[in-house]
């Protein structure tokens, strides 16, 4: 995990001030931010115009129905939606049979952001289920008896760290997990997602995340990884899945977060990356797109906005005098407005954009992005601003791991008390060698 500095990620819960300014998206001049296609229609411009029209309807309806606009996060409805999902899912989720640890993580993290306690019986049931997903070869599969894969391994470790009990921590077979990571490591520093699978930046991040949380990083496990990730940064400034590919929000987050863990952020052109990610916030909608010329999507409220705390800290460490000491480098108010007005399902749960269905994935990442937009800095530089009613305030999330900062500290403290698997044996063997003249 990255070493602490004067600018840290930990934002303790506080009495957050409430935004008193008029809503950004309800200003009379806001319509000027809509797409101007210069009378040259394309497939993408037509789709963008359709989305903007739907969002304009939401903005107009809100303005018409609220004489004094006060945005409200429907906490109770979201809580009940999440609570039901932990116990029972409809057959619509059959397609996610290989993503069951993800469902645990998405729901548990959403609950911790809402500051909803996880009952002990539920925590125990989740632990027992995830133990069934752990492979004898190391790592976790998408369900009991499935092949291990780095994506559900990341989700399972995060879920267990959110639960944060000794019972949860001890489910993770650290020795086998380290062996599994070595089996995926490639000569160029990259990692396979699973044995015989594809290589991309996600796997490097998932490996770095679980290894750093559980204290199994060895001197050579990530040899060459930072250099490989740096080759994935392209001319746009963002990061693609592999070298030479188009920059994408999800891959960019994974790449930068992995480098933060490895303390190699300076391997990237940070100013170019900053320009790319800030250009992904949509002028009219207020949310983020994942790639250039794509539509807004609520999940990028985290994948893109979550990059800004990482960049802020990296640039702060370089002594950049232009950095704000009270706000991230994106329009925090506009993002909060998009999530609260456009991404909440009336029945509970959050979604991609108006017209889309709710799901646990978007619920998790919309709430994560909302938390990022509410909380800035820590200590003397703590500056929290919550849009709408005070009850909208969420718990902070760690932008590297996307679980509570306190859960990161708790997990790393626990696992740092244990030796890195194999390291002590190697040290003992070395010390047992006879001295030479």
Swiss-Prot record:
It comes from the Eukaryota. Its cofactor is Zn(2+). Binds 1 zinc ion per subunit. One of its GO terms (biological process) is positive regulation of cell population proliferation. Signal peptide: none annotated. InterPro entries: FTB (IPR026872), PGGT1B-like (IPR045089), Prenyltrans (IPR001330), Terpenoid_cyclase/PrenylTrfase (IPR008930). It is an enzyme of class 2 (transferase). PFTB repeats lie at residues 123-164, 174-215, 222-263, 270-312, 332-374. The modification Phosphothreonine is found at residue 436. One of its GO terms (molecular function) is acetyltransferase activator activity. One of its GO terms (cellular component) is protein farnesyltransferase complex. Zn(2+) binds at residues 297, 299, 362. It catalyses: L-cysteinyl-[protein] + (2E,6E)-farnesyl diphosphate = S-(2E,6E)-farnesyl-L-cysteinyl-[protein] + diphosphate. Keywords: Lipid metabolism, Metal-binding, Phosphoprotein, Prenyltransferase, Repeat, Transferase, Zinc. Heterodimer of FNTA and FNTB. Belongs to the protein prenyltransferase subunit beta family. This is Protein farnesyltransferase subunit beta. It comes from Homo sapiens (Human).
């Amino acid at each position: 995990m990255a070493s602490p500095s004067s600018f840290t990620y930990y934002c303790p819960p506080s009495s957050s001030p409430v935004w008193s300014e008029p809503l950004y998206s309800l200003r009379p001049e806001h319509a000027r931010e809509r797409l101007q296609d210069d009378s040259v229609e394309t497939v993408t411009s037509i789709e963008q115009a359709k989305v903007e029209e739907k969002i304009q309807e939401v903005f107009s309806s809100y303005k018409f129905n609220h004489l004094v606009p006060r945005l409200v996060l429907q906490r109770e409805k979201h809580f009940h939606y999440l609570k039901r999902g932990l116990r029972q899912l409809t057959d619509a989720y059959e397609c996610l049979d290989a993503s069951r640890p993800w469902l645990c993580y998405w729901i548990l993290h959403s609950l911790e952001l809402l500051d909803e306690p996880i009952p002990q019986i539920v925590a125990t049931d989740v632990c027992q289920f995830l133990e069934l997903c752990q492979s004898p070869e190391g790592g976790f599969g998408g369900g009991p008896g499935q092949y291990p894969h780095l994506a559900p391994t990341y989700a399972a470790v995060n879920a267990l760290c959110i639960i944060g009990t000794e019972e949860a921590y001890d489910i993770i077979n650290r020795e086998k997990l380290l062996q599994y990571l070595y089996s995926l490591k490639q000569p160029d520093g990259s990692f396979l997602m699973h044995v015989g699978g594809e290589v991309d930046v996600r796997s490097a991040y998932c490996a770095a995340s679980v290894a750093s949380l559980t204290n199994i990083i060895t001197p050579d496990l990530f040899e060459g990884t930072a250099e490989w990730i740096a080759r994935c940064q392209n001319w746009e400034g963002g990061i693609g899945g592999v070298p030479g590919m188009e920059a994408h929000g999800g891959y960019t987050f994974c790449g930068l977060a992995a480098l933060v863990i490895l303390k190699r952020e300076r391997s990237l052109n940070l100013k170019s990356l900053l320009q790319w990610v800030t250009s992904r916030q949509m002028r009219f909608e207020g949310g983020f797109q994942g790639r250039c010329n794509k539509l807004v999507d609520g999940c990028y409220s985290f994948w893109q906005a979550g990059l800004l705390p990482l960049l802020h800290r990296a640039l702060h460490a370089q002594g950049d005098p232009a950095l704000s000491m009270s706000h991230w480098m994106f329009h925090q108010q506009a993002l909060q407005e998009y999530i609260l007005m456009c991404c909440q399902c009336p029945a509970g749960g959050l979604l991609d954009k108006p017209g889309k269905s709710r799901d646990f994935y978007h619920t998790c990442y919309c709430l994560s992005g909302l938390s990022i937009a509410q909380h800035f800095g820590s200590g003397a530089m703590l500056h929290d601003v919550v849009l709408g009613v005070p009850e909208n305030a969420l718990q902070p999330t760690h932008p590297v791991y996307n679980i509570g900062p306190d859960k990161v500290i708790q997990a790393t403290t626990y696992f740092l008390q244990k030796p890195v698997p194999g390291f002590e044996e190697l040290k003992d063997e070395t010390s047992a060698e006879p001295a030479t003249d």
